[in-house]
UniProtKB/Swiss-Prot annotation:
Family matches, as SMART domains: tRNA_SAD
GO CC annotation, single: cytoplasm
Organism: Dehalococcoides mccartyi (strain CBDB1)
Self-association state and partner proteins as the record states: Homodimer.
Pfam families per record: HGTP_anticodon, tRNA-synt_2b, tRNA_SAD
Domain of life, source organism: Bacteria
Keyword rRNA-binding among record annotations: no
Keywords, in A-Z order: Aminoacyl-tRNA synthetase, ATP-binding, Cytoplasm, Ligase, Metal-binding, Nucleotide-binding, Protein biosynthesis, RNA-binding, tRNA-binding, Zinc
Cofactor(s) annotated in UniProt: Zn(2+)
Any one biological process term the GO annotation gives: threonyl-tRNA aminoacylation
Lineage of source species: Bacteria, Bacillati, Chloroflexota, Dehalococcoidia, Dehalococcoidales
Residues that hold Zn(2+) according to the record: C278, H329, H455
Protein name stated in the entry: Threonine--tRNA ligase
Keyword Transcription regulation listed: no
Length: 582
C-alpha cells in the first residue's frame, strides 16, 4: 500500500499527517515510559490523540517534555516504513502490548500491516507521511481519561490530545481560536452570568436554570411558540413517563434501550422515563377518528425527555441527561410529505437566521445497519428529503448509515462565531411508527388510508441551543434576549429619582431594567454592568435631568447623549425586530 502524500488532496494529506503525528507522540511517550501499554491513536478533526496505559497519572506539566521529544524525532527525519506480516508474527511483535493483541484478535485477515519509525512500531493500516520531518506544526493540548474501547467496564486509559496542521500559521490561528473558545465556554459564562447551575446532589447532567438563564430560555420559547402557531402548529403537552409496553410497541425498547433509564415499578406495572415525545403525539392523533381532509396535522411541544449518557461524556448544557426538545410531529398523506418538509426547512432557516447563525451545512443521513421497515419505503422517504432540499436550493452532503432506526433524516449543523459546528435542526420522515401504531385516516373512498409522519426539531434541545447561543455571543446576548437590557446609573443620590422615573417608563414597555443606586463610584457601576454584559447603560446627572436626555453607554464602550424618548424608541425597535446588533 502506498504511503505517499497526494498533494492533489489537501484534506487527505492533513489527515495523513495528523495520523503520523499520533505515532510520533506514541514514540515520545514510550521513550519516557518504556513499560507503557498502547491503545489507539487516530487522526481527528483538528489533530490527533493517543491512548496510553501508564505507570503513573500524567499532568499538564508532562506535555512540554513529550512535545520536546516529539520535536527531536521530527528533526531526526526518520522514515515511516510499512511492513506486512502474519497475525502470528504480529502477536510475537506485540507480545507485551495487551491492547494491540486484542485488536489483532478482531482482525479477520491473516495478514496485517504495521508501520515503523525510529524505535517505534504500531499495528496500523496507514498511510503515513514519508518522513517524520513532514510533521511541521503541532501542539499538545490536554490529557483526559478514556475507557478502553469506550466501555466503562474496561480499563481507564490516559488520552493525550494534540493539534496538528500543515503549516505553523494555521496552527497559530487554531490555537488563538481555542483561547477565544475558552473565554466563551458556556460553563464558565454560565457561572459568571448566573445562567444555570449543576449540582452533584441532584445528579450529573440535570440542569437548574437560574433566573438570568430562565429569562433567556423563556424568551426563546415564547418566540418559538408564536412562530409555530403562526405556521399552523397546535401546541401540546405530554407526561414525563409511560408504561414500558408503549416503548416496546414503538420499537424504542428494542433499538434504543441502552439510552433509556431502567423501569420503575408503579402498582405492579413497569414505567420508564420518556426518551422521546413522538409516541405520545401518535396516541393524541389516534384520540379520535380523523378524515384525510384534516391533514396535515402539526403537533408541537417543548417536551422534556431523559436519555442515559455516560458520566464521562456529560458537558455543561451541551451534553445532559434531562433536556427539553423543541419537538414537533407532522401527520400527513404521502403526497403531502414533500411540501411539508419544504415548509419545515423554511421554518428552520428562519429560526436559526433570527438567532444570528448564517452559516450552516446540511447532511442527508440514510439507512443505518439496524433499521425497521421495508427497503422501498426507506428509499421513497430518502428521495422525499432530497427533493425538499433541492426545492429549497439547499446544498447537502449524503451521510451514509447515519439515519435513525425508523427513517432517514436531514441534519442541519450551524457554524458559530469561531467556526465550530453545532447540531441544529433535524427532520425525519417516518413510515414505520405510524404502521406500528396502526395510524390511519378515513380516505375519500371511506376506507382507511395510511398516514406518514415527520419528526422535526428546529433548535434541537433548549439546553444545547443555550450552550451554543452563549458561546456564539460570548454571553453578550442581543438586546432582545439579554436577561437585563438596561442599567440606569445615577451619578449622585439626587439623581436617583429621575433614574427611577426613566426605569418606570421602560418597564411599562416590558423592558428589563434596573437602577444601580448603590453608594459606589459611577465608574465602578459602569464596570459592573459591563461585566454583567448588559447591553445599555444610561448615565444620568444634572444635565440629563435638565434636558430630559440620557448619556448612553453600550457594553462595547461606545457613548452617545440623546433624548430619552429617542433612546426608548431605538431600543424598542431593536427588541421588536430581534436585532443582533447593539
Amino acid at each position: 500500500m502506498a504511503n505517499q502524500i497526494d498533494e492533489s488532496k489537501p484534506i487527505s494529506d492533513l489527515e495523513i499527517m495528523r495520523h503520523s503525528a499520533a505515532h510520533i507522540m506514541a514514540e515520545a511517550v514510550l521513550s519516557m515510559f518504556p513499560e507503557a501499554k498502547l491503545g489507539i491513536g487516530p487522526a481527528i478533526d483538528t489533530g490527533f490523540y493517543y491512548d496510553f496505559d501508564l505507570p503513573r497519572t500524567l499532568t499538564p506539566e508532562d506535555l512540554p517534555e513529550i512535545e520536546t521529544r516529539m520535536n527531536q524525532l521530527v528533526k531526526s527525519n526518520l522514515p515511516f516504513r510499512r511492513e506486512e506480516m502474519s497475525k502470528d508474527e504480529a502477536r510475537k511483535l506485540f507480545a507485551n502490548q495487551p491492547y494491540k493483541l486484542e485488536l489483532l484478535n478482531d482482525i479477520t485477515d491473516e495478514t496485517v500491516s504495521i508501520y515503523r519509525q525510529g524505535n517505534f512500531c504500531d499495528l496500523c493500516r496507514g498511510p503515513h507521511v514519508n518522513y517524520t520531518s513532514k510533521v511541521k506544526a503541532f501542539k499538545l493540548l490536554s490529557i483526559a481519561g478514556a475507557y478502553w474501547r469506550g466501555d466503562e467496564k474496561r480499563p481507564m486509559l490516559q488520552r493525550i490530545y494534540g493539534a496538528a496542521f500543515l503549516d505553523k500559521a494555521s496552527l497559530a490561528e487554531y490555537l488563538n481560536m481555542l483561547e477565544e473558545a475558552a473565554k466563551r465556554d458556556h460553563r464558565k459564562l454560565g457561572k459568571e452570568l448566573e445562567l444555570f447551575s449543576l449540582h452533584q446532589e441532584i445528579g450529573g447532567g440535570l440542569v437548574n436554570w437560574l433566573p438570568n438563564g430562565a429569562i433567556v430560555r423563556h424568551l426563546i420559547e415564547e418566540f418559538w411558540k408564536k412562530e409555530h402557531l403562526k405556521r399552523g402548529y397546535d401546541l401540546v403537552y405530554t407526561p414525563h413517563i409511560a408504561k414500558v409496553d408503549l416503548w416496546k410497541t414503538s420499537g424504542h425498547w428494542g433499538f434504543y434501550r441502552e439510552n433509556m433509564y431502567s423501569p420503575m415499578d408503579i402498582d405492579g406495572e413497569e414505567y420508564v422515563l420518556k426518551p422521546m415525545n413522538c409516541v405520545y403525539h401518535i396516541l393524541m392523533f389516534k384520540n379520535r377518528t380523523r378524515s384525510y381532509k384534516e391533514l396535515p396535522i402539526r403537533m408541537a411541544e417543548l417536551g422534556t425527555v431523559y436519555r442515559y449518557e455516560r458520566s464521562g461524556v456529560l458537558h455543561g448544557l451541551s451534553r445532559v441527561r434531562g433536556f427539553t426538545q423543541d419537538d414537533a410531529h407532522i401527520f400527513c398523506l404521502y403526497d403531502q410529505l414533500e411540501k411539508e418538509v419544504v415548509k419545515v426547512l423554511d421554518l428552520a432557516k428562519f429560526m436559526i437566521d433570527t438567532f444570528g447563525f448564517t452559516k450552516y451545512k446540511v447532511m442527508l443521513s440514510t439507512r443505518p445497519e439496524k433499521y425497521v421497515g421495508e427497503l422501498d419505503k426507506w428509499e421513497y422517504a430518502t428521495d422525499i428529503l432530497a427533493k425538499a432540499l433541492e426545492a429549497n436550493q439547499i446544498p447537502y452532503q449524503v451521510d451514509p448509515g447515519e439515519g435513525v432506526f425508523y427513517g432517514p433524516k436531514i441534519d442541519i449543523k450551524f457554524e458559530d462565531a469561531l467556526g465550530r459546528t453545532w447540531q441544529g435542526p433535524t427532520i425525519q420522515v417516518d413510515f414505520q411508527l405510524p404502521e406500528r401504531f396502526d395510524v390511519s385516516v378515513v380516505g375519500e373512498d371511506g376506507k382507511d388510508q395510511p398516514v406518514a409522519m415527520v419528526h422535526r426539531t428546529v433548535l434541537g434541545s433548549m439546553e444545547r441551543f443555550m450552550s451554543c447561543l452563549t458561546e456564539q455571543y460570548g454571553g453578550a446576548f442581543p438586546a432582545w434576549l439579554s436577561p437585563k437590557q438596561v442599567m440606569v446609573i445615577p451619578i449622585a443620590d439626587r439623581h436617583t429619582e429621575f433614574a427611577e422615573k426613566l426605569a418606570c417608563e421602560l418597564r411599562e414597555e416590558e423592558v428589563r431594567v434596573e437602577v444601580d443606586s448603590r453608594s459606589e463610584t459611577m465608574n465602578q457601576k459602569i464596570r459592573q454592568a459591563q461585566l454583567a454584559k448588559i447591553p445599555y447603560m444610561l448615565v444620568v446627572g444634572d444635565k440629563e435631568i435638565e434636558t430630559q436626555s440620557v448619556a448612553v453607554r453600550t457594553r462595547t464602550g461606545s457613548q452617545q447623549v440623546m433624548p430619552f424618548a429617542e433612546f426608548k424608541s431605538m431600543l424598542l425597535a431593536k427588541i421588536k425586530t430581534k436585532s443582533t446588533e447593539i
